[in-house]
């Protein structure tokens, strides 16, 4: 049991280190623009090209690496992230920095898909949602914690200090994985064609559409939350920052809660989630911008729902393609990214 818990902990922190590299740079884009003498739109490519790399690699890279020793694959991915982050510290021009961002992006879904698969396989089937929830907590923490830490480091020192932080975290996880993760050979590798054949199943495509819609419904609106709080609710900047932090922290709590709910009553959880989300948005539309206590309560509920959402999305594809876990988790990552992109575009109108 202790070894199992240690494995889940290392996987969760490993995912945190990957997401920390992806999301941590968001808050320091202006500093990157200043350091490399580019405009903010060009600096934004450090985020958008990374996300594009993840979306492209999602269905392919986990599939390609599914037959190799899982520990070796984890070390490869963490090694690539560490080397690229370390080289980014001394990157002399913006084009080189972009390359050093794009290369690890293609390995991002490999580690994340692997983490979900290994976590689910390390416990009894009925406990798999709880184990996966631990990994999603690492995802949420990477999105929430990475941004403020990198922001503080870059503001206190310079942009390169944030890159040192990214390299240090992935490097530490490389060492911990090497030392404490047992050898994880794939005893019965599944043929690539057999894994791809899951795409012939209509429920798989229904699950993909559901993930796109669910993730779009959460992040499509969340991406405009700061603007909503400023322009509609007319809140001061300090309070907006506090509410965004509360939302992020409750995402972590929601991930934990979502795992327990899916383990106990998966059908009810999946069916009620869209209804709860619709109700929340209706209340937000009707009175969220006028009543601060109601707005605060809705953001609390929204943060929890956001965490539950990630677990439901992974669960939907895992159920309909359980015989190809690495490939299905790669599809989940791609569908989630497409949902975020589509939701953001539609909500912007």
Q: Each PLM stretch: what is its role?
A:
Residues 37, 69, 90-96, 287-289:
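Helix-breaking motifs and short loop linkers at transmembrane-helix boundaries and internal kinks
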Residues 96, 125-126, 130-181, 224, ...:
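Helix-loop-helix hairpin linking two adjacent transmembrane segments in secondary transporters
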Residues 58-69, 254-266:
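Helix-to-loop junctions at the C-terminal end of transmembrane segments
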Residues 100-138:
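Cytoplasmic helix-loop-helix junction between adjacent transmembrane helices
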Residues 84, 95-104, 293-301:
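Paired small-residue
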Residues 268-313:
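C-terminal transmembrane helical hairpin of 12-TM major facilitator-type secondary transporters
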């Amino acid at each position: 049991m202790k070894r199992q818990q240690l494995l889940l902990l290392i996987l969760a922190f490993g995912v945190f280190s990957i997401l920390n590299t992806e999301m941590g740079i968001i808050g320091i884009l202006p500093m990157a623009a200043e350091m490399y003498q580019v405009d903010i739109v060009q600096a934004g490519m450090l985020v958008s090209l990374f996300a594009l790399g993840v979306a492209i690699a999602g269905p392919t890279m986990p599939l390609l690496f599914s037959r190799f020793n899982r520990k070796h694959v984890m070390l490869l991915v963490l090694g690539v992230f560490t080397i690229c982050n370390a080289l980014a510290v001394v990157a002399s021009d913006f084009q080189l920095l972009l390359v050093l961002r794009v290369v690890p992006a293609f390995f991002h879904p490999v580690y994340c898909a692997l983490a979900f698969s290994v976590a689910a396989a390390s416990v009894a089937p009925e406990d798999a949602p709880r184990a996966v929830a631990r990994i999603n907590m690492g995802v949420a923490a990477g999105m929430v914690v990475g941004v403020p830490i990198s922001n503080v480091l870059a503001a206190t020192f310079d942009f390169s200090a944030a890159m040192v932080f990214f390299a240090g975290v992935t490097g530490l996880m490389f060492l911990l994985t090497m030392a404490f993760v047992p050898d994880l050979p794939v005893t019965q590798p599944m043929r690539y064609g057999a894994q791809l054949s899951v795409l012939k199943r209509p429920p798989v495509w229904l699950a993909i559409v559901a993930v796109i819609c669910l993730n779009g419904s959460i992040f499509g609106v969340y991406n405009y939350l700061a603007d909503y709080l400023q322009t509609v609710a007319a809140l001061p900047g300090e309070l907006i920052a506090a509410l965004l932090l509360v939302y992020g922290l409750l995402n972590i709590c929601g991930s934990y809660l979502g795992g327990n709910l899916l383990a106990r009553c998966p059908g009810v959880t999946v069916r009620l989630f869209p209804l709860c989300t619709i109700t929340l948005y209706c209340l937000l539309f009707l009175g969220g911008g006028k009543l601060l206590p109601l707005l605060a309560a809705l953001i609390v509920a929204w943060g929890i729902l956001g965490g539950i959402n990630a677990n439901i999305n992974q669960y939907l594809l895992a159920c309909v393609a359980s015989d190809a876990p690495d490939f299905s988790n790669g599809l989940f990552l791609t569908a989630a990214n497409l949902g975020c992109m589509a939701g953001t575009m539609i909500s912007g109108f």
